[in-house]
Curated annotation (Swiss-Prot):
Annotated organism of origin: Caulobacter sp. (strain K31)
BP-aspect Gene Ontology terms: L-histidine catabolic process to glutamate and formamide; L-histidine catabolic process to glutamate and formate
The keyword Cytoplasm appears for this protein: yes
Gene behind this protein: hutI
CDD domains reported for this sequence: Imidazolone-5PH (cd01296)
Example of a GO cellular component annotation carried by this entry: cytoplasm
Annotated protein name in UniProt: Imidazolonepropionase
Any one GO molecular function term: iron ion binding
Length: 401
């Protein structure tokens, strides 16, 4: 078999559907051609390779490149002062209603140029890449005007031009009510549906549309309108749902065949059943749970029992999860949410790919998929979840290089 590169003498965690658990292959080989995997499996079953380069992994573990399926990586400014206020007793809702929160970041984002947004996001992206990230989802949602939302999405896309990483973008215009629409949330949703989404779609700047369905965000009826507008433009949807209360957002997301519903601390049985039936992935965000000192756990066992796919993400954002470590996210998910090692690792590979609609292309070590790899100096995969402040990444491969 002709190929560009071969990684031999490796232990693989393939996450392939046909293998149990995380798909372990003890004596494994991965081969790539033109950026795609052409073989991933046991050395004893591998064809004869004609390779330009063969790399001896010396028994190291190879997983798919890590995927962060929920971030707000592009934003202006900083919210460290709000962190101090929260430590002094202020709640997320109190800070938001006092003009802080998302709106304060909106002002800084509007004031920044596209280039400035790219420059400020790069250190955050680099921190994730340093831990084996190869694909990231990035939302807009801090511009909250047509021009500034477009600027934010362009900045997110531009990150893929300056780093070897795949970026998927999500339009989150329905994130918060901008000051110019104070007292008129329906008027703002009109703007999102009739001006913003058509413009975003026309420029091809978004791979999906998201909304914040919450008491301090937008109602279920308003979210439905956003989803209908997205559907008319052929864009899949995602939803911030049931984080602070239960507005039946997850069930609404499932009704529209959403890729994912995210947060879910207040999710109920009806929402779980709807997600399971629709095949909507649950994206769990332990960093936000930790940072805002939430006490209500997402219903992990009920989601697990219903067969809802479980993905994990950093939720990197300036206000409620300034987290740029997927490895720490793994430990938080295991420690706080009682997820298993296998669930955690699948949550940042296979299930994360599912959550962004890219499972046909990334997320597992299988022939035909992008050759995105993370190569680790570990004895067993559990060490990626168990250790904190520990980065055993040996090498990262993106599209075969």
């Amino acid at each position: 078999m002709r190929c560009d590169r071969v990684w031999s003498k490796a232990r693989l965690a393939t996450f392939a559907a046909g293998r149990p658990g995380i798909g372990v292959v003890e004596d494994g080989v991965v081969a790539s051609l033109s950026g795609r995997i052409v073989y991933a499996g046991p050395a004893t079953e591998a064809p004869a390779f004609e390779a330009l380069e063969t790399l001896d992994c010396e028994g190291r573990w190879i997983t798919p490149g890590l995927i962060d399926p929920h971030t707000h990586l592009v934003f202006g400014g900083d919210r460290a002062r709000e962190f101090e206020l929260r430590l002094a007793g202020a709640t997320y809702e109190e800070i938001a209603r006092a003009g802080g929160g998302i709106v304060s970041t909106m002002k800084a984002t509007r004031a920044a140029s596209e280039g400035e947004l790219v420059a400020s996001a790069l250190p955050r992206l680099d921190a994730l890449i340093a831990e084996g990230l190869t694909t990231i989802e990035i939302k807009s949602g801090y511009g909250l005007s047509l021009d500034d939302e477009l600027k934010s999405l362009r900045a997110a896309r531009a990150l893929a031009d300056v780093r070897k990483v795949s970026v998927t973008t999500t339009f989150l215009g329905a994130h918060a009510l901008p000051p110019e629409y104070e007292g008129d949330p329906d008027g703002y949703i009109d703007h999102v549906c009739y001006q913003m989404i058509p413009a975003v779609a026309a420029e091809g700047l978004a791979d999906a549309v998201d909304a914040f369905c919450e008491g301090i965000g937008f109602s279920r009826a308003q979210t439905r309108r956003v989803f209908q507008a997205a559907r008319e433009r052929g864009l899949p949807v995602k939803l911030h749902a049931e984080q602070l209360s239960n507005l039946d957002g997850a069930a609404l997301a499932a009704e529209f065949g959403a890729l994912s519903a995210d947060h879910l601390e207040h999710l109920d049985g009806a929402g779980i059943a709807a997600m399971a039936q629709a095949g909507t992935t649950a994206v769990l965000l332990p960093g936000a749970f930790y940072f805002v000192r939430e006490t209500r756990l997402p219903p992990i066992q009920a989601l697990r029992a219903a067969g809802v796919p479980l993905a994990l993400a950093t939720d990197c954002n300036p206000g409620t999860s300034p987290l740029t470590s997927l490895l720490l996210t793994l430990n938080m998910a295991a420690t706080l949410f009682r997820m298993t090692v296998d669930e955690c690792l699948a949550g940042v590979t296979r299930e994360a790919a599912r959550a962004i609609g890219r499972l046909d292309h990334i997320g597992t070590l299988e022939a035909g998929k992008s050759c995105d790899l993370a190569i680790w100096d570990i004895e067993r995969p559990a060490q990626l979840v168990y250790r904190m402040g520990f980065n055993p990444l040996h090498a990262r491969v993106w599209k075969g290089l």
